[in-house]
Amino acid sequence: AYARALGVNIDELLLSQPDSGEQGLEIAGKLIDSGAVDLVVVDSVAAFVPRAEIDGDSGDSHVGLQARMMSQAMRKLSASINKTKTIAIFINQLREKVGIMFGN
């Protein structure tokens, strides 16, 4: 109801809730490559958890894994974005205190 009140055409809105960051980026890539959409919004990049982190043990070190995943994805997506003229918006969060999930 809120989105409709803001003018969003709900009937043409595609919504995805991927299981991993890689899956979300793959979905975004396929949508962009198809040329069927004008806008792709990823909210939030911070919630894109790499598959290795999901499948790994809680004590495993995953330093830089998300950054590498996003860097690789952006290299792949940028050519498709340029070719199809799709707008891609990636929303992220800034955190002042590491480990705090919500707020500062």
Curated annotation (Swiss-Prot):
Superkingdom field: Bacteria
Major place of residence: cytoplasm
Keyword Metal-binding: no
Protein name, entry field: Protein RecA
Function of the molecule: Can catalyze the hydrolysis of ATP in the presence of single-stranded DNA, the ATP-dependent uptake of single-stranded DNA by duplex DNA, and the ATP-dependent hybridization of homologous single-stranded DNAs. It interacts with LexA causing its activation and leading to its autocatalytic cleavage.
Any one GO CC term of the record: cytosol
Organism the protein comes from: Streptococcus salivarius
PROSITE patterns hit by this protein: RECA_2
InterPro entries per the UniProt record, alphabetical: DNA_recomb/repair_RecA (IPR013765), P-loop_NTPase (IPR027417), RecA-like_N (IPR049428), RecA_ATP-bd (IPR020588)
Subcellular location: Cytoplasm
Record GO biological process: DNA recombination; DNA repair; SOS response
Coiled coil: none
GO terms of molecular function: ATP binding; ATP-dependent DNA damage sensor activity; single-stranded DNA binding
Family assignment from sequence similarity: Belongs to the RecA family.
Transport is among the record's keywords: no
Keywords from the UniProt entry: ATP-binding, Cytoplasm, DNA damage, DNA recombination, DNA repair, DNA-binding, Nucleotide-binding, SOS response
